[in-house]
Every structure is written in C-alpha cells, then in structure tokens.
Amino acid sequence: MAKKSKIAKEMKREKLVNQYYELRKELKAKGDYEALRKLPRDSSPTRLTRRCKVTGRPRGVLRKFEMSRIAFREHAHKGQIPGVKKSSW
C-alpha cells in the first residue's frame, strides 16, 4: 500500500491537469510558450503517474482496469472483475 500522502498528491495533480486542460490546449495551439511557462508545473499531464486505484502502487498498472498486476490477479481469482477468467490452453 502506498503512502496516503503520495496518493493525495497524485489526486491533486490530476485535479490540476483537468482544470487547466482547455487553457493549455489553447496556449499550445497559439504557440504562447511564455504563458504556458507561467501555469503551475503540476498542471502538465506529463507529471501524472498512473497509480492503482486499489493499492496506490505506481508500477505495474494495467491501463484498462486501473489496477496493479497484483491487485488485478487477486480480484480476478475471486471473480470480482466481470468478464475476466483464467485462461488455459
């Protein structure tokens, strides 16, 4: 489990990215890099890290399910993820 402060910081960044999305898009289209530079650093989508919604783990996150590989495996074995079943061949 990740530290609560790290998860909170990531949520704050996500909020800022969503807040400044349209403005950043307009400024980039105009080519106004001076105004872009004055925006908060955390408003850049590059600074976001995909984290597991269950554990907050930053690595090994499956995009489709927004879960880490470990949490995905646990939930899949319990049958808590619809449409997912263990394959065998």
UniProtKB/Swiss-Prot annotation:
One of its GO terms (cellular component) is small ribosomal subunit. PROSITE patterns: RIBOSOMAL_S14 (PS00527). One of its GO terms (biological process) is translation. InterPro entries: Ribosomal_uS14, Ribosomal_uS14_bac/plastid, Ribosomal_uS14_CS, Ribosomal_uS14_sf. Binds 16S rRNA, required for the assembly of 30S particles and may also be responsible for determining the conformation of the 16S rRNA at the A site. Belongs to the universal ribosomal protein uS14 family. PANTHER family: 30S RIBOSOMAL PROTEIN S14 (PTHR19836), SMALL RIBOSOMAL SUBUNIT PROTEIN US14M (PTHR19836:SF19). This is Small ribosomal subunit protein uS14A. It comes from Staphylococcus haemolyticus (strain JCSC1435). The gene is rpsN.
